[in-house]
Amino acid sequence: MKSAMRNNSLLLISNLSLALMVSFAALASGAGATDTKSNGGMFAARDAGARGDGTNDDTVAIQAALDAAGQAGGVVSLAPGRYLVKASLRIPPGVTLQGVHDAPNWSAPLKGSVILATAGRDAEEGPALFEMGDSSQVRALTVYYPDQRPKDIRPYPWTFHLRGFDNTVEDVTLINSYNAIRIGPEPNVRHRIRNVYGCALRRGVLVDTCSDIGRIDNVHFHCHWWSVPEVGGEWAPVHEYMWKNCEAFIFGRTDWEYVNNTFVFPANIGYRFIHTAAGEANGHFSGIGADEAQICVKVESIQRMGLLISNGQFVAMRGEHPRQVVIDKSCSASVRLVNCAFWGPAEQNVVAHGGRFLSLSDCYFSSGYSAKTSGPPLVEADAGRLQVRGCSFDAAGPGIALRKGLRHAIISENNGLRGVEIVNEIGTNAIISLNEPAEPAPAPGR
């Protein structure tokens, strides 16, 4: 059904645009005043009939320009304007769709090259707004769904769908995408997602079936991108929807994923690692952040070599049991966190019910409990093997709980607000040394 819907939509656009595409391609190949060589591979969407007035449907004209550029590869430029797009656009292999605004666009969201997307309301499984082929690129534009409402948020298909080799989404602002960027599930390699800012309501980036080093850099999801009155925004309902529903970064099968300088506020789950029909993820995650989340990082299933997470900042404060890192029983691989900070009113910082190895090094742990109120252990594990070294525990009560089921632990060189209180239920299977001794709990009322 999903494939038929996508194919029917793309066939309709192709048929509607045939005459315009032929005439525009003839101009580009030499039948008119210019040709592909003399214009340097640049194609203007307005030369193909796009108006950019926000009223007339520009879908057919933009697709005609894209198809003309696809004959030999090239760039389709979108001059400043508001381009109403009522169906899916196919970006052919070797083609770039390029607007004029490289910077994030918050205070004046409808300036520059803006796509007004209206297709797919209540049809989440339909074709994406941009269906991207091998070595295609979309950059320097803004996407806005004018029919979406903050108090009546409805499902829409993905804004971007990447498949194949070497796709790029860069310098893009998303005002109110329901589902933002999907990579796969078709086989793909070496995606590049760079400098994407905006509001992703339900899902931000989903990666799957990537067999060779994808890269995600400088991606920032925040509810305030859909708070400006000019685009019908409203902080409170958008904020609430995101912390209840948004999964910002989801990783299925991806080999050697590189993720740097990414952030979400707020979220149901900031970073989620799942099993799909294609497999699981491994990779390097540096400078990542999740704020006002229910769970910042949720590890359900990963490849055996696992995850390397460094310089992360995690704040959990929503839901019944806010926690920063949760490793499920279904995980049987390695998770390593270095130089990360955990703060805010979280109930716990790291909870591990699975995993082959878990390593926490040079991290700062704290919770919303006051210095005089003892809460649950900040770090708790009941499976796999655990190492905690060189960390600081800035809260009252137990810092670490080694529960029955944990096979082995090394706890060393840690300090804390009142020393480091360690609950040890695994006896001699724990090596505990060189930690600041725990102080007695203060008397009631003191």
Question: Can you say where each PLM-predicted feature lies in the sequence?
Answer:
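Bacterial N-terminal signal peptides
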Residues: S14-A26
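The right-handed parallel beta-helix/beta-solenoid scaffold, focusing on the short coil/turn
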Residues: G41, G74, G81, A87, ...
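Feature marks extracellular polysaccharide-active and adherence modules
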Residues: A79, K86, P92, Q98-V100, ...
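Extracellular beta-strand-rich solenoid/capping regions of secreted or surface-exposed proteins
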Residues: Q63-Q71, Y83-Q98, P104-A140, Y144-D166, ...
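Acidic Gly/Asp/Thr-rich repetitive segments characteristic of extracellular carbohydrate-active
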Residues: A45-A79
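Bacterial N-terminal signal peptides that target proteins for export
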Residues: S3-S17
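Extracellular beta-strand/beta-solenoid scaffold signature
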Residues: K111-F130, P150-H161, N176-I183, C199-S211, ...
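Leucine-rich solenoid repeat scaffolds
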Residues: I400-G445
